[in-house]
Design a protein with these regions (language model features):
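Short acidic/polar active-site loop segments enriched in Thr and Asp
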Residues: 62-63, 162, 181
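Non-catalytic positions within long, well-ordered alpha-helices that form the structural scaffold/packing
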Residues: 57-60, 157, 176
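Active-site/ligand-binding-proximal alpha/beta "capping" segment
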Residues: 125-162, 245
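His/Asp/Glu-rich mid-to-C-terminal helical/loop segments that flank catalytic regions of hydrolases
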Residues: 193-241
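A short, charged, Gly/Pro-tolerant segment at domain boundaries
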Residues: 233-273
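Metabolite-binding pocket within alpha/beta catalytic cores that recognizes anionic/polar moieties
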Residues: 1-111, 267-274
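Generic non-transmembrane alpha-helical segments
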Residues: 117, 121-132, 219-227
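Zn-dependent metallopeptidase/amidohydrolase metal-coordination segment
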Residues: 166-204
Length: 274
């Protein structure tokens, strides 16, 4: 990237994982957030997902690609393969998964949690690289930070999931609420703990294969950027148009003010009353 600068962003939901890195890539403005903080200081359960997504939204980001290390739950998805999942299963336990509440209720559809346009562009970019790419499948997100027991891994496999990780939920839910196009580029590093002839997942295995995958991920992202361009024609930019069920007359002023970035364009009269 060129014209790089690190920018601190304050949000109504606390501090994001780190400062946001802004710059230009092939002439396009891009923003990067080290999700676990520089130096990997934050465990999955410690991530402030709301602040992270809010920060991206406030900086004008429209497309979010979540790069994530995952374990493979299918024989055909080998370590160092790339996966672009189309479904998520949220098995987390301790994470706040919505911007809404405190007097304003919204229900955003999650039947198709991944933006199809972004996923298609991501697949096109990935297939231009030497990496093996799998499009589709389900990512199960567990709480962590521990890896699965063998019994848990076998149960997840019986559910038909394809990869397992610790970070894409509630990230995908919050991206939908923020009307951002969202997709995950999953980097397979291991076979979790279910495989009979491969070692059980360990930090050493994850780090070794992740380092090898990083070059592939960077290559994919470089090829992806030119494929994205306004206007967005998917449903993502208007997901909140009919999602807020609370009457505007009942909006608590403080909550309405806090959520202005998300709902201000739909409720301008409420905004002027604040």
């Amino acid at each position: 990237m060129t014209d790089v600068r690190w920018r601190r962003v304050r949000t109504p939901f606390g501090d994001p994982s780190d400062e946001f890195c802004e710059g230009r890539l092939d002439g396009r403005r891009v923003v990067f957030l080290p999700r676990h903080g520089r130096g990997h200081r934050l465990a999955p359960s410690e991530l402030n997902f709301r602040a992270n997504i809010w920060g991206l939204k406030s900086l004008g980001v429209e497309w979010v690609v979540s790069v994530a290390a995952v374990g493979s739950m299918k024989e055909k998805i080998e370590p160092r393969h790339l996966v672009i999942p189309e479904q998520f299963f949220d098995a987390t336990k301790r994470r706040v998964s919505s911007f809404f509440g405190d007097g304003i209720v919204a229900h955003v559809g999650m039947a198709e949690p991944v933006c199809p346009d972004l996923a298609t562009a991501l697949e096109k970019a990935a297939r231009q690289t030497p990496a093996t790419v799998h499009r589709g499948g389900t990512y199960i997100c567990i709480e962590g930070p521990q890896f699965s027991t063998r019994a848990e891994s076998q149960v997840y496999r019986s559910w038909g999931v394809d990869v397992i990780g610790m970070t894409s939920m509630p990230e995908a839910k919050l991206a939908r609420e923020a009307e951002l196009c969202y997709a995950t580029l999953a980097l397979a590093t291991d076979y979790d703990v279910w495989h009979q002839t491969h070692e059980a997942v360990s930090v050493e295995t994850v780090v070794q294969n992740l380092q090898k995958n990083v070059a592939s991920a960077k290559d994919v992202l470089r090829r992806l950027i030119p494929l994205l361009g306004p206007p967005r024609t998917c449903e993502c930019p208007r997901l909140l148009a009919n999602a807020v069920i609370t009457s505007p007359k009942a909006f608590p002023p403080a909550t309405r003010k806090r959520l202005d970035l998300l709902i201000g364009r739909y409720f301008p009269k409420a905004r002027r009353r604040d």
